[in-house]
Design a protein with these regions (language model features):
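N-terminal beta-strand motif that seeds the catalytic metal site of vicinal oxygen chelate
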Residues: 1-16, 67-69, 119-136
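Core segments of cupin and vicinal oxygen chelate
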Residues: 2, 9-51
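Vicinal oxygen chelate
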Residues: 4-13, 42-45, 60-136, ...
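A short beta-turn/loop motif at secondary-structure boundaries
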Residues: 34-37, 59-61, 95-98
Length: 136
């Protein structure tokens, strides 16, 4: 089971302004722009790095605008079984959007981690590259 750090997901009180900032100054490219989990989500590629944005203001001013760290795995069910077998509770069960399925867990210090798996058969060539699915 392979895993790698994939992205940081940020709240954006003005998502258009955030997108413009990262594209104009850092050469970011919008790879996906869609509605997931009730909000507009925009996935940006910035060089080899990745940023995801929620179209909503930060919910907790103490935590700032970082929502979660995304860790991609090639076998979400196996990862979930490994975590739960060792007593790490899931925040909720697996959510499946067809091309993307995920769950969340809390790491030490209450860092929210999104564990996710994507199905490259449902993605474009650019999206497959974004998720590094041809280079595990």
């Amino acid at each position: 089971m392979a895993c790698h750090l994939h992205h940081t997901h940020l709240f954006a009180s003005d998502i258009s302004k955030s997108i413009q900032f990262y594209t104009e100054f850092f050469g970011g490219q919008v790879v996906m722009d869609l509605k997931m989990a009730g909000s507009r989500n925009v996935f940006l590629s910035v060089g080899r790095g990745k940023l995801h944005f929620y179209d909503q203001a930060p919910k907790n001013p103490v935590r700032g605008n970082i929502h979660h760290i995304g860790i991609q795995t090639d076998n979400l069910e196996e990862m979930v079984n490994k975590l739960t077998a060792r007593g790490v509770p899931l925040k909720k069960g697996i959510t499946d959007f067809g091309f993307w399925k995920y769950t969340t867990v809390l790491a030490p210090d209450n860092v929210l981690i999104e564990l996710f798996q994507v199905d490259k058969t449902q993605l474009s060539k650019e999206q497959t590259a974004y998720f590094d699915l041809d280079n595990p």
